[in-house]
A protein has these predicted regions:
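Active-site catalytic microenvironments for nucleophilic, acid-base chemistry
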Residues: 157-161, 245, 323-330
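C-terminal substrate-binding/catalytic lobe of Rossmann-fold NAD(P)-dependent oxidoreductases
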Residues: 27-66, 167-168, 177-305
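N-terminal Rossmann-like NAD(P) cofactor-binding subdomain of oxidoreductases
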Residues: 1-193, 200, 296, 342-343
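Short glycine-rich or small-residue beta-strand-to-loop segments that form or flank ligand, phosphate
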Residues: 2-5, 142, 241-243, 305-308
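Conserved active-site and cofactor/substrate-binding residues in soluble primary-metabolism enzymes
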Residues: 11, 125, 146-153, 202-210, ...
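C-terminal helical cap and adjacent loop that interface with cofactors, partners, or active-site loops
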Residues: 282-343
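Short, well-ordered loop/turn and helix-capping segments at boundaries between secondary-structure elements
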Residues: 22, 217, 326-330
Length: 343
C-alpha cells in the first residue's frame, strides 16, 4: 500500500515515518511538505535509511493520485487549510493535529485561538479515533491528543459503568518535552527544563474539550473536570494521575473496579492493567502500550487512577497507525510490535 505523510519534520511525523517504514502492509511512503526547502526536509532522514527519501511539494491532486491514504502530522491549523479537497473526494486522511477532533467550530476557535477552515458538517462526521473504543467508519479520522488519550483510557471503565461521581474528576497530567512540539520556546529550553518541573496551561489546555466531548458521549450528564498539565524533564512519556469519588457503597469496591477495567480491556492488545501496582513511564516509553493502575482509599472514598503512555506513540504516531490498521482491516498490531525501552 502506498501512503502519504504530510508534515514529517516534527517529532510525531518522524516517529510516524519510522513506524510506517516497518509496516508489513506499506510498500511505499511518499513525503509531502509545504516548506520551500525540500532538500533540507529530506536530509533529516539520511541517517535513518540507505534508501533515497524523496520529498515533494504539497499537491492535493497528486497525493490522491499516487497514494491510498494521507497522514497529516502538521501543526494545528494546517490540516484545516489543506484537507477539504481530500474530504470532498472521500479520500481517507488520518490527522494527528487537533483540527478534526472537536465537533463544534466555536469550541475549536476558543481553545486553539484560531478559526477553523473545516465545516461543521465535516467535523460532525469525523471519526474520533480512540481505537480501543471507536469503530472507524468515516474516511477522515481525528487522532486523539496525547493528554486526552491517557485520561480517557484511565476514566473510561469507571465513567461508562457509572462507578464514580461524574462531578468529582480531577486530572493531574504530566508529559515529556516532546509533547510541546519541536518549536523552541522559553518553557522547553534545556536550561529551563533540566532538573526542573513546571506547570503550564492550567485549565486552558486544548485537549480539555476533546476529553469532555468523549466523556459526554459515554455519560451525557458528565460534569466538568479539573485538569492540570505539567512539563517533565524527560524527552517522552506521559502520566495522567486521575482522582474521583467512588459512588459504589460496598465492601467489594476494589473487586468492582478491577472487574470494570478487566471487562473493558481484556481483549485489547495495547493495554496493560496492573494489579496492586502503579505504572511508571519505563513500562511504556518506546511502545504503543497504555499501562493503568489504581488505588482506592476507603477512608476518603477516592480512587486514584494512574494511566501512562508514550506521548509520541500511543499519544500520536502509534495510535495513528492503529487507526490506519483498523480502517483498512489490517491486524491491529501490524507495525506496532515495538517493546518498551525499559533502560
Amino acid at each position: 500500500m502506498k501512503v502519504a505523510i504530510v508534515g514529517v519534520t516534527g517529532y510525531s511525523g518522524t516517529v510516524l515515518w519510522q513506524l510506517l517504514s516497518q509496516h508489513p502492509n506499506v510498500t511505499e511512503i511518499n513525503i509531502y511538505t509545504t516548506q520551500a526547502d525540500l532538500e533540507a526536509v529530506a536530509q533529516q532522514f539520511d541517517w535513518q535509511t540507505k534508501q533515497t527519501v524523496r520529498v515533494m511539494p504539497f499537491d492535493a491532486g497528486q497525493i490522491m493520485a499516487d497514494n491510498e491514504v494521507a497522514f497529516f502530522a502538521t501543526p494545528a491549523g494546517v490540516t484545516g487549510e489543506l484537507a477539504e479537497t481530500f474530504i470532498e473526494n472521500h479520500f481517507p486522511i488520518i490527522d494527528l493535529s487537533g483540527d478534526l477532533r472537536l465537533q463544534d467550530p466555536k469550541a475549536y476557535q476558543k481553545w486553539y485561538h484560531r478559526a477553523t477552515e473545516v465545516s461543521r458538517e465535516t467535523l460532525s462526521h469525523a471519526t474520533y479515533g480512540l481505537t480501543e473504543f471507536t469503530a472507524t467508519t468515516t474516511d477522515y479520522i481525528a487522532n486523539p491528543g496525547c493528554y486526552a488519550t491517557a485520561t480517557l483510557m484511565g476514566l473510561a471503565p469507571l465513567v461508562q459503568e457509572r462507578l464514580i461521581d461524574l462531578d468529582s474528576v480531577i486530572v493531574d497530567a504530566k508529559s515529556g518535552v516532546t509533547g510541546s512540539g519541536k518549536k523552541l520556546s522559553q518553557a522547553t529550553h534545556y536550561v529551563d527544563v533540566d532538573e526542573n518541573f513546571s506547570l503550564y496551561k492550567l485549565n486552558q489546555h486544548q485537549h480539555i474539550p476533546e476529553i469532555m466531548q468523549q466523556l459526554k458521549q459515554w455519560a451525557p450528564d458528565m460534569g466538568p473536570i479539573q485538569f492540570t498539565t505539567g512539563l517533565l524533564p524527560v524527552k517522552r512519556g506521559l502520566m495522567a494521575t486521575i482522582y474521583a469519588k467512588v459512588t459504589a457503597d460496598s465492601a467489594d469496591v476494589n473487586e468492582i473496579i478491577a472487574a470494570a477495567f478487566q471487562a473493558t480491556y481484556m481483549d485489547k492488545p495495547f493495554v496493560k492493567i496492573l494489579a496492586n501496582d502503579m505504572p511508571d513511564l519505563r513500562l511504556v516509553v518506546g511502545s504503543n502500550m497504555t499501562a493503568i493502575g489504581w488505588s482506592y482509599n476507603p477512608v476518603t472514598h477516592i480512587v486514584t487512577i494512574v494511566s501512562v503512555i508514550d506521548n509520541l506513540m500511543k499519544g500520536a504516531a502509534g495510535q495513528a497507525v492503529q487507526n490506519f490498521n483498523q480502517y483498512f482491516g489490517f491486524d491491529e498490531t501490524a507495525g506496532l510490535a515495538q517493546l518498551p525501552l525499559m533502560i
